[in-house]
Amino acid sequence: MKWLSLTLLLLVIPPVLNAAGWPEMSWTKDVGARRRPAASTVFLVNDYGAVADGRTSGTAAIQKAIDACAGKGGGIVSFLPGKYLSGSLFLKEGVHFQIPEGVVLLGSTQLSDYPDIPTRVAGVEMMWPAALINVLGTENVSVGGKGIVHGQGKVFWDAYWALRKEYEPRGLRWIVDYDSKRPRTLLVAESTDITVSDLTFQQSGFWTIHILYSQYCTVDNVVIQNNIDGHGPSTDGIDIDSSSKILVQNSDIDCNDDNICLKAGRDADGLRVNRPTEYVVIRNCISRAGAGLLTCGSETSGGIRYVLAEGLRAKGTSVGVRLKSAMNRGGITEHIYIRDVDMENVRIVLEATMNWNPAYSYSKLPGEFNGRLLPDHWNKMLQVVDSVRGTPFFRNVWLSDVKIRNSAEFMRVSGNKTSYMEQFSFRNIDAQVQKAGSVNYARNWEFTNVTIKADDLKELRLQHAENLQKK
C-alpha cells in the first residue's frame, strides 16, 4: 500500500457535523475565566517591607500585601522596579497579582521556603512543596504584568539528576520523580475564574503552570523559557490536570518536557479520583524546544475529552501531537480536534502509544525494600491495577490542515490488541519528512487529501490495521 501521496475515503462520520465538516463544538464558547478582579486600589509590596535587591527574602512582606489587599475586598498587589526573592506565596479572592515590566520575581533556591501541601503531582495525590505562586481553593484571581518570574530552578534540576543517578541502578526509576521534590512555578488548584496573562516565566524548578481540579481558567500571552543554564527535567510548560473549561492562547513555550499537556491522574490513584480533563481550547501558541506541542497523557486515568487546539506552531519540538499512556493507567482519551498547525524540525509529527516509558510507568519494588515501612506515595504507586481497569483507550482524534517541513517521521502509532487506536481522521495534510513511519493496532481511520513526501520513498508500515480505506 503506497502512502507517500494519497487521498483516502472518509470512513468515520461523527453524529453532528457543521458546514465545514467538523463536529459541532458549541462548548468552545464557554471556556476561560468569566471575570477578573475589578478593584483598583494598589497595595505596593515595598510598603510592607519587601526589598528589591534580589537577595533579601521578601516572602513575608509580599504575603502581607496580598493579605491586606484581600482583606479590603481585593485590588492590585504590585512592585516597584527591581528583583525580589521569595518562597511560596498564596493569592486570595479578588487579588490581581501584578508583576510589572522592570520587575523580576525570583524563586528561592531553598526547598524549605516551599512548605509541603496536599496536592497532586504527576498524577498522584501526595504531599509536595507548594509552588512559588499559589492560587488554592479560591476564585476571581489574576496574575499578570509584563515582568519576569524566574524560578531559579537549576538547583532543583541538579538534585533530581543526582538522585536519578543513584536510583536507576537500584530499579527505582519509577519513583525518582516523586522522591525528588521540586517546586512548580505557578499552581492553580480547586479554583474558578483565574487568569494568568502577559508574564514571562523562566527556569522553572518543575512544571511551570499547573492547573489542577479547576474550571474556567485562562492562560493568555505568556512566554515560558525553561532552557536556561541546563537541561531541566519535567519542566513542562502548561499542564491542565483534571480541569474543565480552560482556555490557553497566544503563548510561546520553550521548555524541556511537554509544552502543553493535558492530564487526568495515573494508575490506581488516578482511577480512584476519576476526574477528567474536558472542554479545553488551545489556540495561537508556539512551541519551541520541548517534548510535545500538544500532549495528552501519560496520566489518562480520569479521561481526557473535548479538546480543540488550533493555530499552533511547532518549531523544533520533539513531537507535534503526542498521545501517551500505559497499560495500568486506564481512562478514555477522545474527541480531540486539532487544526491549522505548522510544524518544522520535529522528530515525530504524531506519536501515540499505550506503553510509554516502561521503566517510569510500571512500579516494581526491589527486593532490598521487602519488609520495610514505605512512604505513602510509594504504596500508592505500587497498587496493582487489573488489566480491565488499566487498559487505556484513544479514539475520535482529528488532525486537519497541517503543514510539516524538514521533519523526521510522520507517525509512530502503537495500540494494543485489546485496545485499538480508533477513529482517527486526517485531512488536508502536506508533510515533508524523512520517513512515513508505522501504525500498529489501528481501526477505522480516515485520510482525506493527505500528502506524505518521504525522503526514503518507503510506505507507511501497517500491522493489525483494520478499515483504512483509500481511493
Model-derived segments and spans:
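Short glycine/acidic-rich loop motifs that flank beta-strands on beta-rich extracellular proteins
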Residues: G74, G87-S88, S108-Q110, P129-A130, ...
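Active-site-proximal loop/turn and secondary-structure-junction residues that shape catalytic pockets
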Residues: K83, Y213-Q215, A264-R266, S298-T300, ...
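Extracellular beta-rich repeat passengers
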Residues: T300, G320-K471
